[in-house]
């Protein structure tokens, strides 16, 4: 367990200090499901780019984008990466591909999970995340990955998905560790990111379902070691989300670390590292 959190810390702080990002090219892209999954998200039409940052919306066809580790530096570690976007779109270009490419250059296989948007079908993202972990395990020998060193990383709403996987995994989809950047954790009205709640739960936004998806309430002693990173002045996802998850991990004697940067707001690396300058 200590090795897992040590690996997570090294990954994150090496990444935060690496400017500009350089890494490996995309190795392959594979369908997440060999046959269409049972539950459909009800979205029709092609994927679209939305907003000034070009997030990917209307995602109904999930894939894994695999950036294999530099062979000369391969550590045997792999990370499944869940970009954020409020469960309504995916920040693939900000919180997916660049990070995976950089990890691969450091000897860590980066696997970007392009998961389906739930559109109120709340089970869909977690099922995609579990399947992503299973596929990495299935290809472990081919991709030269140690099955005991497969972790999950998530940003914002992708952090909520990663935290849900960390607390609701099955034997075939258990992460060795978690790395959560400014994650949505709680669906409690006092702390929740409302857009994420609405997009994930839709009309099923009952108090029972909000409790079910409040991941600070789902931690057990079997939750994998987890590292959390965020900015103190995040105005999009309240810092209390990460603090509650950290406290729950400590109460359950799960190895954990929490880093709160003094500034940076809500967003990826370029903002988080401002305090270093």
Where are the model-predicted features located?
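Bacterial Sec-dependent N-terminal signal peptides
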Residues: 1-27
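Active-site nucleophile elbow and catalytic-triad environment of alpha/beta-hydrolase enzymes
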Residues: 62, 203-218, 223-224
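Short beta-strand element of the alpha/beta-hydrolase
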Residues: 75-84
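Active-site glycine-rich loops that stabilize anionic/oxyanionic intermediates
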Residues: 83-88, 232
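Catalytic nucleophile-loop/oxyanion-hole region of alpha/beta-hydrolase
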Residues: 90-100, 111-147, 270-274
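Primarily recognizes the serine-hydrolase "nucleophile elbow" in alpha/beta-hydrolase
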Residues: 131-196, 210-211, 215
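Short beta-strand/loop motif that positions the catalytic acidic residue
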Residues: 222, 227-230, 234
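C-terminal catalytic histidine-bearing segment of alpha/beta-hydrolase fold enzymes
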Residues: 239, 243-277
């Amino acid at each position: 367990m200590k090795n897992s959190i040590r690996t997570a810390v090294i990954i994150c702080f090496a990444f935060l200090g690496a400017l500009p990002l350089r890494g490996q090219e995309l190795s392959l892209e594979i369908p997440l499901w060999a046959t269409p999954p049972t539950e459909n998200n009800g979205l029709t039409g092609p994927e679209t780019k939305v907003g000034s940052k070009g997030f990917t919306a209307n995602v109904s066809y999930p894939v894994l984008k695999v950036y294999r580790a530099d062979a000369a530096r391969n550590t045997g570690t792999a990370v499944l990466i869940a970009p954020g976007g409020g469960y309504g779109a995916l920040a693939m270009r900000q919180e997916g591909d660049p990070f995976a490419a950089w990890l691969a250059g450091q000897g860590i296989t980066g696997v970007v999970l392009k998961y389906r948007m739930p559109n109120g079908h709340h089970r869909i993202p977690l099922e995609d995340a579990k399947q992503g972990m299973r596929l990495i395990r299935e290809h472990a020998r081919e991709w030269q990955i140690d099955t005991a060193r497969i972790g999950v990383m998530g940003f914002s709403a992708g952090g909520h998905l990663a935290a849900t996987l960390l607390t609701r995994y099955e034997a075939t989809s258990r992460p060795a560790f978690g790395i959560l950047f400014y994650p949505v954790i709680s669906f409690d009205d006092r702390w929740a990111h409302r857009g994420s709640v609405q997009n994930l739960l839709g009309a099923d936004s009952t108090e029972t379902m909000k409790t079910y998806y409040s991941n600070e309430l789902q931690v057990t002693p079997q939750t994998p070691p987890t590292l959390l990173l965020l900015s103190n002045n995040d105005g999009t996802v309240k810092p209390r989300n990460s603090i509650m998850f950290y406290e729950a991990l400590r109460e359950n004697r799960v190895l954990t670390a929490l880093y709160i940067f003094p500034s940076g707001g809500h967003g990826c690396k370029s903002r988080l590292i401002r305090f270093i300058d």
